Regions:
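Core RecA-like ATPase module of SF1/SF2 helicases and allied nucleic-acid translocases
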Residues: 1-207
Length: 207
């Protein structure tokens, strides 16, 4: 994972969240944590893989834990009718809040091959991989590129990363890594791509 790996960055940023920690299994959760629903597809297709949200409430018990999640979008009771969660209201921002429980132990029902009762269907996502960020947009994006990862940064990967930001973008890299990455990028014939890369060549590390 490395010092600047996704797991370490997530732990570091979560530590700045002042809300109480709730440990469940091997993971730690806090109210206010940003999350991404993952590949378990428990609530698919209404809530699909990589849907964004935020932990709105956590209610741990001895045998199960209840999560209240603020979604990025608004859904109604008809939309939620057939899914294994409860639509409990809206946040002040007008976003839907759903509630569901996760069991501490997996069901022993051998006839239920698709039992997901003990699966937490999301991951804490202060930081995500560039691959995971495809199709997502954020108001502010910070990209960390180290000398250990610079060789894997192709034109397409770099373009995907920098176009996730709607308003604010920062790239954290050393001058040597910056030069190495930009020299190896294959600038496509598109004038838009070329202009974007020329703008980024002036980016420097910010503390």
């Amino acid at each position: 994972d490395g010092l600047y790996g996704i797991n370490n960055i997530n732990r570091f940023l979560q530590n700045s969240n002042p809300n109480e920690s709730v440990v469940w299994g091997i993971n730690t959760y806090k109210v206010g944590d940003p999350i991404l629903f993952n590949e378990s597809n428990i609530f698919s297709p209404l809530i699909h893989n990589n849907s964004k949200g935020k932990i709105f409430g956590i209610h741990p018990g001895e045998q199960e834990i209840q999560f209240d999640i603020e979604l990025e979008e608004s859904i109604n009771e008809i939309d939620a009718w057939e899914y294994d969660f409860e639509l409990i209201g809206e946040s002040e921002a007008g976003k839907s809040i759903i509630s569901f429980t996760v069991s501490k132990y997996r069901s022993t029902d051998e006839d239920d091959e698709d039992n997901n009762s003990s699966v937490v269907p999301f991951q804490v996502a202060y930081a995500v991989s560039i691959h995971k960020a495809q199709g997502l947009e954020y108001d502010s994006v910070k990209i960390v590129i180290t000398n250990e990862t610079e060789e894997r940064i192709t034109h397409n990967i770099f373009y995907t990363a920098i176009t996730r930001a709607k308003n604010k973008l920062k790239v954290y890299w050393s001058p040597e890594t910056e030069q190495s990455v930009l020299e190896r990028l294959e600038v496509k014939s598109s004038q838009k791509d070329a202009h974007l890369l020329s703008q980024l060549s002036s980016l420097t590390m910010e503390n």
